[in-house]
């Protein structure tokens, strides 16, 4: 809008050099140039808009601004007047350099400014004066010239007692110069530096001098116990104890309360030392190892990891650290899925991590054990784009390249295994180049300490922890200064301290607890458990070297991220294998093929049913109980129809439709079996019941009433309907999921396939199947038995019972085989469906073909299409087809018997001829004797009968 107001103004070029005094014009005020090293802030206009105009409207205001450490001298704001001029044009505006404003204040003193006004400009003079009991250290005057004060800023220092009159306060320290952690090699010189700096200050403990009494603990609790006894029971009295490593600090801190001593450690990281009930007077400038845990949890949340695994060396420091981590991740909604530990050999735990598919792994162990772990990691291939390892950051930078005879991995293999891992390390040296309370920067401290050491820092134990030891002395000095009333405040006499004086101990404790200052290691402050709060450095091993990727301040929950993290796979991996659930569906080719067969079977059943109904007046059909055959055809149709829902799964239907499909399977198959097999079973049952009676009960054969057959079928169907109804109401079928073992995909992707299969099931499925299979199996076995028993029965009432028996054989065999096989193959959807559906199809086909095709063939080939009335009118005889068949069979049997009789007669004639020939031959050899008057000579008792004699009764035996 303002630009629209300026459009009518003429665009006119400025004069040479940009005149400061614009010409009067009714159009507004001409744009003026800013002062040197300065600029003009145009309110409401952009830079492009300012370039497009030369005049500004009346009442428009501009503001001068200066660059760098400069201030505007003269009018800072000018306003366009109605006469076309700017306000206060007679006074120029300049940007001049100012001197540091810190010289305008003095702690414990006053500053007097002359020759200028605030802020301090060129020519300004300041004079410094200290308060009573303080004296000025430095020049009392300074002049501002071209932005610089002529002298360094002085400070006010408390008037101290002369050095010879200062009272000594003793510190008992234990430095581990050797052993598991030789941190005393660098920490002792750092403590000595701090004592020199503190004792040289007049504003801290002006009446006292801190002195050190120390021993080498060798990081051994036993050795430390000896020196602790010497410190406590030998003069002079020590006002505080300073142990180093965690094992020694645990011993000292637990015993110190008995002597009312404060314990201040510079190198202990064990989380167990944070227990205030066990260690009530313990403080440490070395942060607890649990300080890594908030950083780890923050990184887990940053990368969206919800499941992690851990592996630790079995020591107290790592066990307590892991316990703390477990509590923190639980609060953050993260789960530790697998936890492993080892004492010396990590081979088995690493294998377990691999077997459990651990992806995000936190490792807590010392440097030597770290090499063993990652040698096993390489062997198990537990590294790469799928895995992230979190390690402790205080290892040496080349720890994985160090020769170690206890492992059998090369440097190249170790380098490959550790690539990409994350480390968290406590910030022990202030990364900012700011001055600490000792007036030294962190870099100046490192340079000064390096000159003091007798060997290279990388070869000196505890060099990283040296800033913590230096700041520990400063924390102690400030606490004692506050307790003693240093700086003009009232306090207690430190020289009155003894091991029974709890009052002084309590005051020192409160002073230590409220410590807050800037040290060379950063901001020093203690939490409620006496542990140092500090920043955490986050690094990642990239290309064989560690790169800083961020810092984390747990006190403020502030994560400073440099976005320099690199991942082997291009992005952070998942915390677990991504499981893709896939359903196993029935083969559509198999389903379509069986469906076609089932459809053709239904068509065949309809044809057979139609044929049977159409020819129900034919006597031959009537004698086969056509209504039962009709029920068989209907039952086969229902069973064949069950094939369709049997093959439907999630590929075709939704989850909500699945229960209906399950019920359709059950009812169609159940009713189909009851009608189809039940009608055949009824036939064979009544044939066996009626036509296998003894002779005295032949009257039963004449009284086979059809309603009894229908009642039997109805009973079987009713039992199924009742059972199915109870099943559906009490325990209905529903969709259940069967889950299989995970499968690896063919592609190289970080996913796992979880196959699943849908089933129709209920809570007590086995019970219901037991009931069904129990009585259905009995029916099948009984049907086989009855079919076998009636195979030789011939009856006019049910003329197709032999075909029924054959159908029962086939149905029973298929059912008895298929039922257990499908239960075994239930997890293989194609095989189970193929067995079940093909058994239904084949049994239905066989039943229909065996029962109906012979009838069709007989009626077609013999032309027996007449009804019983028509047949009687045509022949005039009541002989039925069954009697004709019997007559034909009897005639055939008669012919066969006549043939046998002829053969026998021919044989008899032959034997008679042979007998006569022998009699004639014998009469020639023995002439005839006179006849006995009695009619013949008597034979002796032993004389055999004559072979030529022939008894008529014997001849008749030949015809039998």
From Swiss-Prot:
Ubiquitously expressed in tissues including the forebrain, cerebellum, eye, atrium, ventricle, lung, stomach, small intestine, colon, liver, spleen, kidney, urinary bladder and skeletal muscle. Expressed at low levels in testis, and more highly in brain regions. GO terms for cellular component: axolemma; cytoplasm; dendritic shaft; dendritic spine; endoplasmic reticulum membrane; extracellular space; G protein-coupled GABA receptor complex; G protein-coupled receptor dimeric complex. Residues 20-590, 652-666, 731-767, 825-832 are extracellular. Glycans are attached at residues 23, 83, 408, 439, 481, 501, 513. One of its GO terms (biological process) is neuron-glial cell signaling. Keywords: Cell membrane, Cell projection, Coiled coil, Disulfide bond, G-protein coupled receptor, Glycoprotein, Membrane, Phosphoprotein, Postsynaptic cell membrane, Receptor, Repeat, Signal, Synapse, Transducer, Transmembrane, Transmembrane helix. GO terms for molecular function: extracellular matrix protein binding; G protein-coupled GABA receptor activity; G protein-coupled neurotransmitter receptor activity involved in regulation of postsynaptic membrane potential; G protein-coupled neurotransmitter receptor activity involved in regulation of presynaptic membrane potential; protein heterodimerization activity. 4-aminobutanoate binds at residues 246, 269, 286, 366, 465. It is found in: Cell membrane; Postsynaptic cell membrane; Cell projection, Dendrite; Perikaryon. The modification Phosphothreonine is found at residues 872, 929. Residues 29-95, 97-158 form the Sushi domain. Residues 887-915 are annotated as: Interaction with ATF4. Residues 1-19 form the signal peptide. Belongs to the G-protein coupled receptor 3 family. GABA-B receptor subfamily. Heterodimer of GABBR1 and GABBR2. Homodimers may form, but are inactive. Interacts (via C-terminus) with ATF4 (via leucine zipper domain). Interacts with JAKMIP1. This is Gamma-aminobutyric acid type B receptor subunit 1. It comes from Rattus norvegicus. The lineage of its organism: Eukaryota, Metazoa, Chordata, Craniata, Vertebrata.
């Amino acid at each position: 809008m303002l630009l629209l107001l300026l459009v009518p103004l003429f665009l006119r070029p400025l004069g040479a050099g940009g005149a400061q005094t614009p010409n009067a014009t009714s159009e507004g005020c001409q744009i003026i140039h800013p002062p040197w090293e300065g600029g003009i802030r145009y309110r409401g206009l952009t830079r492009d808009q300012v370039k497009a105009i030369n005049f500004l409207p009346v009442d428009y205001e501009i503001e001068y601004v200066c660059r760098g450490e400069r201030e505007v001298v003269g009018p800072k704001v000018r306003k366009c007047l109605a006469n076309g001029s700017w306000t206060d044009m007679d006074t120029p505006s300049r940007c001049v350099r100012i001197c540091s404003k810190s010289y305008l204040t003095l702690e414990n003193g006053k500053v007097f400014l002359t020759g200028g006004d605030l802020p301090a400009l060129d020519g300004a003079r300041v004079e410094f004066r200290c308060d009573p009991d303080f004296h000025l250290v430095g020049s009392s005057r300074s002049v501002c010239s071209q932005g610089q004060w002529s002298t360094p800023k002085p400070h006010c220092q408390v008037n101290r007692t002369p050095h010879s009159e200062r009272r000594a306060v003793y510190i008992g320290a234990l430095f581990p110069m050797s052993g598991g952690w030789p941190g005393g090699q660098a920490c002792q010189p750092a403590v000595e530096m701090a004592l020199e700096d503190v004792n040289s200050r007049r504003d801290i403990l002006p009446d006292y001098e801190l002195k050190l009494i120390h021993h080498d603990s060798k990081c051994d609790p036993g050795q430390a116990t000896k020196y602790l006894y010497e410190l406590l029971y030998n003069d002079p009295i020590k006002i505080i104890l300073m142990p180093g490593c965690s094992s020694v600090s645990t011993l000292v801190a637990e015993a110190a309360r008995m002597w009312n001593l404060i314990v201040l450690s510079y190198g202990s990281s064990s989380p167990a030392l944070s227990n205030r009930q066990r260690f009530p007077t313990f403080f440490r400038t070395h942060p607890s190892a649990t300080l890594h845990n908030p950083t780890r949890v923050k990184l887990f949340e940053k990368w969206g990891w919800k499941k992690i695994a851990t592996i630790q060396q079995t020591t107290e420091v790592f066990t307590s650290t892991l316990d703390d981590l477990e509590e923190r991740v639980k609060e953050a909604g993260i789960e530790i899925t697998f936890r492993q530990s080892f004492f010396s050999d990590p081979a088995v735990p690493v294998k377990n991590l691999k077997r459990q598919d651990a992806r995000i792994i936190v490792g807590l162990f010392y440097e030597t054990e770290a090499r063993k772990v990652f040698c096993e990691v390489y062997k198990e291939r537990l590294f790469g784009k799928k895995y992230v390892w979190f390690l402790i950051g205080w290892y040496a930078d080349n720890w994985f390249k160090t020769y170690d005879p206890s492992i059998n991995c090369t440097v190249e293999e170790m380098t490959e295994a550790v690539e990409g891992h994350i480390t968290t390390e406590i910030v022990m040296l202030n990364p900012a180049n700011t001055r600490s309370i000792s007036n030294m920067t962190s870099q100046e401290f490192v340079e000064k300490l390096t000159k003091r050491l007798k060997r290279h820092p990388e070869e000196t134990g505890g060099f990283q922890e040296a800033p913590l030891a230096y700041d520990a002395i400063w924390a102690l000095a400030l606490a004692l200064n506050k307790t003693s009333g240093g700086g003009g405040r009232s306090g207690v006499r430190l020289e009155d301290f003894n091991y029974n004086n709890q009052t002084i101990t309590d005051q020192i404790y409160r002073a230590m607890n409220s410590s807050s200052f800037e040290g060379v290691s950063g901001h020093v402050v203690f939490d409620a458990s006496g542990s140092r709060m500090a920043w955490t450095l986050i690094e990642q091993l990239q290309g064989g070297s560690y790169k800083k990727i961020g810092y984390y301040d747990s006190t403020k929950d502030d994560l400073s991220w440099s976005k320099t993290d690199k991942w082997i796979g291009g992005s952070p991996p998942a915390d677990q294998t991504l499981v893709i659930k896939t359903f196993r569906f029935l083969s559509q080719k198999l389903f379509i093929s069986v469906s076609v067969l089932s459809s053709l079977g239904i068509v065949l059943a309809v044809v057979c049913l139609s044929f049977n109904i159409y020819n129900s007046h034919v006597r031959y059909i009537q004698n086969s109980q056509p209504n039962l055959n009709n029920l068989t055809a209907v039952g086969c149709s229902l069973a064949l129809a069950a094939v369709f829902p049997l093959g439907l799964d999630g590929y075709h239907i939704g989850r909500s439709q699945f229960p209906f499909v399950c019920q359709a399977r059950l009812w169609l198959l159940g009713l189909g079996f009851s009608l189809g097999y039940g009608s055949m079973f009824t036939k064979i049952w009544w044939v066996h019941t009626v036509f296998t009676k003894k002779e005295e009960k032949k009257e039963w054969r004449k009284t086979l009433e059809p309603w009894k057959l229908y009642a039997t079928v109805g009973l079987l169907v009713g039992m199924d309907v009742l059972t199915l109804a109870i099943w559906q109401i009490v325990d209905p079928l529903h969709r259940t999921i069967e889950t299989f073992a995970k499968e690896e995909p063919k592609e190289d992707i970080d996913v796992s396939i979880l196959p699943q299969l849908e089933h129709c099931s209920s809570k007590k499925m086995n019970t219901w199947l037991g009931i069904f299979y129990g009585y259905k199996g009995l029916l099948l076995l009984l049907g086989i038995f009855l079919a076998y028993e009636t195979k030789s029965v011939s009856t006019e009432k049910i003329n197709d019972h032999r075909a029924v028996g054959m159908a029962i054989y086939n149905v029973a065999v298929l059912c008895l085989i298929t039922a257990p096989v499908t239960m075994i193959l239930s997890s293989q959807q194609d095989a189970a469906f193929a067995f079940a559906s093909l058994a239904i199809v084949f049994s239905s086909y066989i039943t229909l073909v065996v029962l109906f095709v012979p009838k069709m063939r007989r009626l077609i080939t013999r032309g027996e299409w007449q009804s019983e009335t028509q047949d009687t009118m045509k022949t005039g005889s009541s002989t039925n087809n069954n009697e004709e068949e019997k007559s034909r069979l009897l005639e055939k049997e008669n012919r066969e018997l006549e043939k046998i009789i002829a053969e026998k007669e021919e044989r008899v004639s032959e034997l008679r001829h042979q007998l006569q020939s022998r009699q004639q031959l014998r009469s020639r050899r023995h002439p005839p004797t006179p006849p006995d008057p009695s009619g013949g000579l008597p034979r002796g008792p032993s004389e055999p009968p004559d072979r030529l004699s022939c008894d008529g009764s014997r001849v008749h035996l030949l015809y039998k």
